[in-house]
Amino acid sequence: MILQISNAVDTDTVKSIVAGLDAGQFSDGKKTAGWAAKDVKNNQQLSGKKSEAATQVLLDRLQQNALVQSVMRPKQVARVTINRYQQGEYYGTHMDDSLMNGVRTDISFTLGLSPLSDFEGGELVIEDASGERSWRLGQGDILMYPSHYLHRVNPVTKGSRLAMIGWVQSLVKQPNYRELLFDIEQSLKAEFDANGKSENFDRLTKVFHNLLREWSDV
């Protein structure tokens, strides 16, 4: 499942984070690329204590977003970083590493930190058997997708694009199982909102928790 959520992190929090970033702490993104991806990676990454503090605040906000948690069902965060693409910078087609810091990567995500008015280009493009799909993420918007896709970031043609990217090991390894659980959970919540703790709500809750119990990797 590929899902975009608008305003996953509130604008005030994102603006505060961005205002505190020191341009001097950005370094060549090739340093963290895999051996093949180094040839196609042309961006910058934030390093140092400010990076750790900023990413932790943003992760905390994402953990408070019920819809984000329902999509990812995170078990462990493998890696997270803030990157920057300035005019002419890009990240060519590549595959994310299957393991990072000894953690399996099931889900990749990008959280936009720049308003769309701050840059042009910089689309995140995901490739699959049906072709390509692209996204431009605004400030606070998140895109979550299974890590098994080839993807790229198109060149920024104007301005500067800031984003936080991360990789997560999910409690539910299989992406089709995660999508089923997401659909069931949204359905049982809709049933509760409409009819309270009805018989249908109880049945859906039973199905949801028994499937989660069956499929969880704990």
Curated annotation (Swiss-Prot):
InterPro entries: Oxoglu/Fe-dep_dioxygenase_dom, PKHD_C, PKHD_hydroxylase, Pro_4_hyd_alph, Pro_4_hyd_alph_FE2OG_OXY
EC identifiers of the protein: 1.14.11.-
Domain of life: Bacteria
One term of GO molecular function: 2-oxoglutarate-dependent dioxygenase activity
Signal peptide: none
BP term (GO), one: DNA damage response
Protein name: PKHD-type hydroxylase IL0759
